[in-house]
Amino acid sequence: TVQLKDGSTLVAKAVVLAAGNFPPPNLNIPGLSEHSERYVPSPWSAAALDDIPKTGSVLLIGSGLTSVDVAVALKTEGFAGHIHILSRRGLMPRIHRATSRWPQFWNEQSPRTTRGLLRLVRAQVRAASEGYGDWREVIDALRPVTQKIWKSLPLSERKRFLRHVRPFWEVHRHRIAPEIGDRITHLVHSGKATVHAGRLTAYREFSHHVEVDWRDRQTQCQRLMRVDRVINCTGPETDCRQIDDPLIKGLLAQGFARPDRLFLGLDVDPNGALVDFAGTPSPFLYALGPIRKGSLWESIAVPELRLQASQLAEHLLGRLLPHPRKIHRVAPQTAGLTLANMATTRAASNEEPVS
C-alpha cells in the first residue's frame, strides 16, 4: 500500500521506484545556508535564474554538465556579466566529435583493478592516436560493457575508482555538443567566464553581494571572490541518507530499503528489487534509474534506461502474470543519441559533481 500526499492510497502487487535525479547535496560551507537569499541550492528550480543582475557576476559551484547548462541558460537569457565556475579540479566536460567505431577491447580476462584498467584504456588511446583515430572512440567502445566492468570490480576497486578516476572519467564519458563547447570556449577566451580549480571554504552574504573564500588548488593560497549570486551546480545528490524526500526517508526508516555500500543510491538485487536492512530482496519493491547507480554505474542515460526498464518489465510480468506475453528485449542504441545530435547540453547523462 502506497500513501499519497493528499491522504489517498494505492494498492499494488509491485511498486517501482523511478524517482529520477534528486536535487544537489547541501554544501557544508561555513556561513552558507540553503535559505541564504543570494544562494540557489538547486539550478533546476523554476526561479533559479530569476533576479540575477544582467551585468553582475555569478559563481557556479561545480564544473560538470549542470554548470554548462546553467552558463548557457544565463547567456541565452541575456546575462552579460561574468561567470565564475569553481570545482575541485577545474575540469570541464570534453567536446563531442563524430568518430568511427573502435573495436571492443575489454573481455572477461581484462584487469579487475582500477590501475590495470587505466593502463588498458591508455594503451588503446595511444593506439588510436597513432592510427589517426580519436580517444573518444576508445571511451565510446566501453559503453556497451561498462556495467559488466563495474560488476566485475571488487568493492575496494570501485571505491578506488571513485576516489581517483571518477572526475576524469566523467568529463571524457559525458561530453558536450560541439556547438555548446564552442560557446563555453568563447566565453572563457573572451574573458566572460573563468574556470577555477579549488575548494570553497567560507560564504558571507551582504545586502547587495556575496563574498566567498576559496582555496586555490595549485597554489594552496586562500582567495576572495565577490559575486551577486552563487548557484549549486554540483549535480544530483546520490547518498540516500542525505536525500530530503519523504518516500526515501520512509523506506529507510522502516527498513524496507538500505543504501548501497558506495552510497550512490539504494541497494538492489540483480533484478532491481530493493534490499532491506536485513539483506533480503523485497518481493514487491523495485528500483529503476539513477538510484541503481551503485550496482550498475551506468544507470542514467536513455539507452541504458530503456534496456533496464525492458528487463524489469519482463521480470515483473513473469512473476505477476500466470501466462505473460513474450517481451522482445530492447538492445542499447547509442546511434543518434550522441550529444552532437542533441539540442541540449546533455545526452541524458549524469552530472559529475566531483570534477
Q: What is the predicted role of each segment?
A:
Residues T1-R115, R119-P322, P332-A347, E351-S355:
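Flavin (primarily FAD) cofactor-binding/catalytic cores of flavoenzymes
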